[in-house]
């Protein structure tokens, strides 16, 4: 088909890339169900907070329905990543016996549908749901699905209007409306094809075993709870049609219109023609049960491609719109009513449309991913058994099949609780903060995944967070200074707390030359001056050759090394949030404990095989290594990898304990004497820090700290952007909700 004037102008001004850069958002509704597929009887999860404020995770029509809403993204992978994170965060907040129903077809409903619990957000919305239940068929109200919200790139409108179309339209708004209108018309005309390709509800209810299967019972016009059709001839006629339907009591309100395409304004419907269409909402996607999030990126990409196509193609003549829409509605009824396992009567037209789209992609240089997608979709037309609806219809027991998937997706979401799907490029603390934010309805934008920079937005207020806990709650200058260990230690000393004596070296030879001095001192702590997790402790100095080897290896990783006196005590990390100590962990150096039967190697492998152990800073508990230091320590015990360690004997593989070298992390929040808590809180208050990690060596956490014995608490360091994850995933003890506490501090006055 030949391009219209808009399409030709787009080609002339090289604007095709802008056409394809639509802003996309998703709304996905899924039911919470129990292990047998019955609706969950629990209330909307408290973890999601206020339904009025959480616009990302809201209740749907029933109390069991959960509506996921993403922010706008231009990039489909980024959009899907956000939805994955949101879905995973929600799953982890469900009761232990709950999961998300993967089908648009209803799960097991009560015999008496009046017993379906309605969502009770507030009195007004609850009354509206009751009115809906009285007016429409309740089973249809209980079906679910996905909506694609789409707005075209505003730069496209601006450029076209400025260059060419300001003379042909009364206003910029009229021009925008005209483009949106022809895209809406096109999506309505192609609804039958979208449904053929992505329909996934052979029957309205999964428990229905007698009705003839269809391509989509939910999206079929007869499956919609309101039977009002939209008039897409003009914006005025669209508004008039819906307004009349409300006046004639066909609809309770304009929000009840559930046609496949909605024109959405940024205000009242009556003002749409004047204020303009804000975005289009395509409402015709069944849940995809092969995806944990209920949406396949291919479906979103296809809807976007259709929209791009119709932006550049001629609109229907106004006098033909109603007739063509009626024909499209009839075509949709025909295709959706077909047996999904058989060839469609519209297979030839379907292939023709896909071929036309393929030509469009090739001619105007759209991404190759679209060409690959169209080839795949074409195979679904030639072999209908590849379609989702056919796959479901061919199941001997669709209920059991859906339950198996629901259980599998739920289990998968909890396999690695320290990771957040869609956000795994971030560090662990940032992922945990993002999970809590998503759960609470805080929008999470990844500004820079490599630098772990997030922008969190709640009710219009934004906060930047670096490395999971670095925020503007702390003074910027001090935050920068504390990244340098020597400077941080000096600041601690200036505030009157005990710190170990130290000296900073800038070459390996300088440090090696002082070997004899440290032998006389009885030991040494070596720290990379710029990396908190590169620490080596020798309580007894090793032979000179090993010391030289270790020092040179350390200088290969850093430009400066701080040598520090050894403090013999237990190592604790105090986590301060909102100026209060919220969590404390003890760090025990990497070790194995013998059982009288297993070799050292077996004990190492067994400990490293635990669920939360893995690569340092990628897993909550870092794996034990066998490097120079660890082998030296084994030699000091006269052990080899094949030695059997006697029962109950602890072998320390290191004498330092950090989060990155295999240390055991134990929660000590409830055990620590309050005198140490008060001392740490006073220190951070004096420094004007709201968030901090404070490392303290304490011989006895139960003994009261007294001024006469300052050696009872020696401060090793302080961090303005401390790790959150060790407190969320300790090896032993209670996990502390520190990510949520940090969010509370960031948005203290927003609730």
Swiss-Prot record:
Q: List the disulfide bonds.
A: none
Q: Which GO terms describe its molecular function?
A: ATP binding; glutamate-cysteine ligase activity; glutathione synthase activity; metal ion binding
Q: Which UniProt keywords apply?
A: ATP-binding, Glutathione biosynthesis, Ligase, Multifunctional enzyme, Nucleotide-binding
Pathway terms, separated by semicolons = Sulfur metabolism; glutathione biosynthesis; glutathione from L-cysteine and L-glutamate: step 1/2; Sulfur metabolism; glutathione biosynthesis; glutathione from L-cysteine and L-glutamate: step 2/2
Q: What class of enzyme is it?
A: ligase
Q: Which SUPFAM superfamilies match?
A: Glutamine synthetase/guanido kinase, Glutathione synthetase ATP-binding domain-like
Task: Give the record's GO CC terms.
Answer: cytosol
Q: Which reaction(s) does its UniProt entry say it catalyses? A: L-cysteine + L-glutamate + ATP = gamma-L-glutamyl-L-cysteine + ADP + phosphate + H(+); gamma-L-glutamyl-L-cysteine + glycine + ATP = glutathione + ADP + phosphate + H(+)
Query: What does the record give as EC number?
Result: 6.3.2.2, 6.3.2.3
Region described as Glutamate--cysteine ligase: 1-336
Q: Which segments does the entry list as coiled coil? A: none
Q: Which InterPro entries match?
A: ATP_grasp_subdomain_1 (IPR013815), Gln_synth/guanido_kin_cat_dom (IPR014746), Glu_cys_ligase (IPR007370), Glut_cys_ligase (IPR006334), GshAB_ATP-grasp (IPR040657)
Describe its assembly.
Answer: Monomer.
* Function per UniProt: Synthesizes glutathione from L-glutamate and L-cysteine via gamma-L-glutamyl-L-cysteine.
Which family does the UniProt entry place this protein in? Answer: In the N-terminal section; belongs to the glutamate--cysteine ligase type 1 family. Type 2 subfamily.
Instruction: Return the protein name.
Output: Glutathione biosynthesis bifunctional protein GshAB
